[in-house]
Amino acid sequence: MSATYDDFQKLDIRVGRITRAEPFPEARKPAYRLWVDLGPEIGEKKSSAQITKHYTPEDLIGRQVLAVVNFPPRQIGPVMSEVLVLGVPDDEGEVVLIVPDKDVPVGGRMY
């Protein structure tokens, strides 16, 4: 399957900062509930992320992440996930977050 640059432009991927993280015991697979500040234009949004192997809730607070903000909300158990926090698999298939390598303003759009 191929994609064009125009396809990529349809994705609204923004920098956010995790403001709150807590275990999500109702999820089918181990996960956290996340609250992500995406700046004044978008505000704070909720997400669910299966990132429990490499991160604790305490590790996540204040961490910058990349998130897709223009997918429709998705019901995950009792949580309505509003953004998709992005990650890649490590050698064992566990999620590692994609993050800016320097602190940048929240809400910035990836291009």
What label would you give each PLM region?
Residues 1-111:
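Phosphate-backbone binding interfaces of nucleic-acid-interacting proteins
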